[in-house]
Structure formats: C-alpha cells, structure tokens
Amino acid sequence: MGDIINGKAESQKYKDKIIEFINERKKQGLDIPCIASITVGDDGGSLYYVNNQKKVSESLGIEFKSIFLDESIREEELIKLIEGLNVDNKIHGIMLQLPLPNHIDAKLVTSKIDANKDIDSLTDINTGKFYKGEKSFIPCTPRSIINLIKSLNVDICGKNAVVIGRSNIVGKPTAQLLLNENATVTICHSRTQNLKDICKKADIIVSAIGRPGFITDEFVNEKSIVIDVGTTVVDGKLRGDVVFDEVIKKAAYVTPVPGGVGAMTTTMLILNVCEALK
C-alpha cells in the first residue's frame, strides 16, 4: 500500500510563509501584493477558478481584483485594458484566463502583458527565460508538481521520469523542471507506442492528459511516484487520470484528485506575485 501525497497539507506550508511575508510588509509600510485577473465571457470553469483564486488570495491578505468582460469585447479594447494594468503601480500581477473567444488572438494579447507582472508565465519573454534557465516566473501547475515531489525528500537526480502530455502549460515545462533536477525525462503523448511498458520502468510518472481513469496499476511499479494532474468532471465529480484506488495499492506515492496538485496551484500563483515584489 502506497502513501498519499497530501497537496492540501503541503500547500499550507507555503501559505504560512506567504502570511509571514505579508505581515512583514505591513509592518514596514510597504505595498501589499495585488493581482488583477481578467476573464472574458462566462465560461463556468474559468469563473470557478477565478472565484477560488480570489477566496484563497484574500484569506492570505493578498488583494485580488476580478475583471469580468463581455465575450463580445474587441481585441483592441482588451489590449488597451492590459496596457493600463501594466502601468498601474498598484497592480503587481496580471492573470488572463484562457481560453479566449475565437475572435481574439490569444498569443497577441498575452504578449502585451508586462513580463514583470506575468505571474502565470504566459508571455514569450518569460517562457524563453524559463527554458534558458534564467530567472523568471515558474508556471504554477508545473511548480506545484515539482514541489510535491520534493516534499517526499526523494533525490530526483538520476531518476527516470515520464511525463504524459506535451502541452505548453503543463507537460513541457514540467519536463524542463525535472531536467533541471537532473532527472532522465521521457515525454509521452497520444502517438507514443508501448506507453504502459515505458511507465512501468519509471521512478516518477506525471500524467497530464485529461483522460479519466487512464492510468491503472498496470502502468506502475512498487517504487513509482505518481502525480495526477488530470481534472475532468464526470457525473458532477472531479476525476483524475489515475485510477487512485488501484494505483495506491501498488505504487509508492500517489496524489489524489481533488486534494493533490490542484490544491497547490493557486498557492503557487500567489507565491509568484509575492516574488514579483522582492
């Protein structure tokens, strides 16, 4: 029987550090971090995510400004809004909820965010710095993943790691963070052959494909650290890529869904905006 990686408990450790940071800034009469979150349209998933971010931010003493825009907003109007936030000294972090409506060029719009306020690491500037190993904001979900693995006090150096999924938001940056820790990384995707055999040999498995119940106990070994990034709503319940009840009986460590990676992500976002002030 393996151990559960408790994302909520690990997240609380970072929250305690954030509260300490905020209290110290208040004592010194310094600015309190403020996040501006932009949502275009009324996508239910995005609204839930934003409301959760706001709730967590404010509970930690972070100011959170929610900006909700009609789906019909013109691209130039959205850019003008972002440019205004860029020069607003009271705003320290800008988040643009994706996806955007089809009539808006997401790549163009995200490029307009000031790289120093790009706490979700969407701009090409921060992406380039990240992959070159220069100081930059680390994407929130990959940062959550690597910190959860490190919380186990396992030496990542030399470990065989498999990342299933090659998205620019999760898969690729997670692979890069594992490389930075000197793991030997294999990125798998929908065209990968013999996926089950590849995973069986891995010390670390990160699944980020959004296919509920895809990873069974046949994919893991007794030493596997399994990180489930999948979040798919099935019959009103959130489900991960991993068949948790099966895999926990065989692998060494497994993250639950919910209560694993997702519990860390918003905290990492807030950590990024705090670091923007340092």
From Swiss-Prot:
Query: What HAMAP family does its record include?
Result: THF_DHG_CYH (MF_01576)
Record-listed NADP(+) binding positions: 165-167, 190, 231
Domain of life the protein comes from = Bacteria
Positions of transmembrane segments = none
Give the originating organism: Clostridium acetobutylicum (strain ATCC 824 / DSM 792 / JCM 1419 / IAM 19013 / LMG 5710 / NBRC 13948 / NRRL B-527 / VKM B-1787 / 2291 / W)
Gene3D superfamilies named among the record's database cross-references: Leucine Dehydrogenase, chain A, domain 1, NAD(P)-binding Rossmann-like Domain
Q: Which UniProt keywords apply?
A: Amino-acid biosynthesis, Histidine biosynthesis, Hydrolase, Methionine biosynthesis, Multifunctional enzyme, NADP, One-carbon metabolism, Oxidoreductase, Purine biosynthesis
What's the subunit arrangement here?
Answer: Homodimer.
Q: Name one Pfam family in it.
A: THF_DHG_CYH_C
| One MF term in the entry's GO annotations | methenyltetrahydrofolate cyclohydrolase activity
Keyword Ribonucleoprotein in the entry? The reply is no
Q: What is its EC number?
A: 1.5.1.5, 3.5.4.9
The protein's name = Bifunctional protein FolD
UniProt catalytic activity: (6R)-5,10-methylene-5,6,7,8-tetrahydrofolate + NADP(+) = (6R)-5,10-methenyltetrahydrofolate + NADPH; (6R)-5,10-methenyltetrahydrofolate + H2O = (6R)-10-formyltetrahydrofolate + H(+)
Fetch the InterPro entries from UniProt.
Aminoacid_DH-like_N_sf (IPR046346), NAD(P)-bd_dom_sf (IPR036291), THF_DH/CycHdrlase (IPR000672), THF_DH/CycHdrlase_cat_dom (IPR020630), THF_DH/CycHdrlase_CS (IPR020867), THF_DH/CycHdrlase_NAD-bd_dom (IPR020631)
A single BP term in Gene Ontology: methionine biosynthetic process
Q: What does this protein do?
A: Catalyzes the oxidation of 5,10-methylenetetrahydrofolate to 5,10-methenyltetrahydrofolate and then the hydrolysis of 5,10-methenyltetrahydrofolate to 10-formyltetrahydrofolate.
Q: Which family does it belong to?
A: Belongs to the tetrahydrofolate dehydrogenase/cyclohydrolase family.
The pathway this protein participates in, as annotated, is: One-carbon metabolism; tetrahydrofolate interconversion
Q: Name one GO cellular component term.
A: cytosol
